[in-house]
Amino acid sequence: MCDLPAPYGLVLTTAASRTEAEALARALVAERLAACVSLFPVHSVYTWQNTLEQQDEWQLVIKTDLTLFPALETKIRELHSYDVPEIIALPIAAGSADYLNWLGASVSPLSPLSRVSLQNQDDKSER
């Protein structure tokens, strides 16, 4: 276990459908705003515009570096179908050093060499 001062955390949001949740997840990971996004179905009960509502939704658990929160929030708002999407950040107090190192590397900006390597992998997978 690693006690960390690094600003890693979980960001929670919900989406109206699996399709929307997957699109959000792919965009966040592709843009290196998230290392990983876990998705699962949930049933929510809430008040919206003074009316009690309940709805099946998809919960996204986004693992990220919280210093990226402003850009991550902007991307979620850009892609989200809700007027007021849930966007809540929770810090990670401790975790596996190996996992947290991977998380940090996954959201770090890519070096030019890494971009070329990834592009080559993409080119090979399209053949």
Regions found by a protein language model. Give the residues of each.
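Positively charged, small/polar-rich N-terminal and surface patches that mediate targeting and assembly
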Residues: M1-R127
